[in-house]
Amino acid sequence: MAPLAPRARLRHAARGGRSGYNAAMPIRYTPSELDQPSLSEADGIRYLHFGTEWVQGAMLIRDPARLVLEYTAQMMAWLLFLEPPREQSIGLLGLGAGSLARFCLKHTRSPVTVVEWNPQVTAVCQMFFRLPTPQRLDVHHDDAGAWVADPARAGDCPVLMVDLYDAQARGPVRDSVKFYRDCRRVLGEVGVLSVNLFGRHESYGRNIDNLSKAFDDRLVLLPEIDAGNQIVLAFSGPPLAITPAELLARAETVEAQYGLPARRWARALTRHAVDGVLHF
């Protein structure tokens, strides 16, 4: 989920209707297959929406695997700490416009597992957002909370990227301590969770608190981007202690190999060094 797209006429991509919501009722959003995808285009970029101007994903038409939105690039900051898995999967909770799936399929050899509630979103991604269909892509149409709660998923994905927003953009639709603990179990013994939050949204503090409880305060916050997104990394496994020089060296490798602004991320993280050491 990202802020509003440039002004452009929205067009429906699939039939359906919006799920009901009463703003006066303090209820949690329930995913609905009736959330209706729609499209817009501006300046060579195709955007995905759910019936509003809020952007659910984007694709550069001439280069579909490029990460157009800055926050989606930041979601890949786990590469500073882990190599892409070979046998286990990179996990994505929320498909959006398929940006992260396309990137991971092009730039890694990892299996990619996607959990997306709405089959219409998957269909739109295949029709309009050039979502590949290799054997190593596995899409589950399921509630992300139920999927991670399944004990059979334990250790399946040492990397898990979470981007779970609804059409109302009211914050992540799954954000309880239990949900994040279940995510940690999916990571297994060693792993990194990457979560997209809105730093200026009322849900932000609750998510940070719940992530801290689930991951024993082992969180890293990347700098908030101008659009308001803030990516949080949470760590599972033995404590990690590295020097700023080691992190910057790794960032150079990531930037050269994947074309991501990893050195900028690393420089921001080095400010948190204590006595010349970074602890994660």
Regions found by a protein language model. Give the residues of each.
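SAM/dcSAM-binding transferase cores
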Residues: M25-E41, V55-R62, L69-E70, F81, ...
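Extreme N-terminal basic, low-complexity initiation segments
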Residues: M1-L10
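The AdoMet/dcAdoMet-binding core of the Class I SAM-like
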Residues: T30, A42-D43, L48, D63-R185, ...
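Short, solvent-exposed secondary-structure boundary motifs
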Residues: G20-E33, N210-A214
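C-terminal substrate-binding/active-site "lid" region of AdoMet-derived donor-dependent transferases
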Residues: V177-A241
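A generic structural signal for alpha->beta connector loops
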Residues: Q36, R109-P111, P134-R136, V190, ...
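A short, flexible beta-alpha/helix-coil linker loop
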Residues: E53-G57, Y165-Q168, L193
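Short, positively charged and aromatic/hydrophobic N-terminal segments
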Residues: R9-H12, R18-Y21
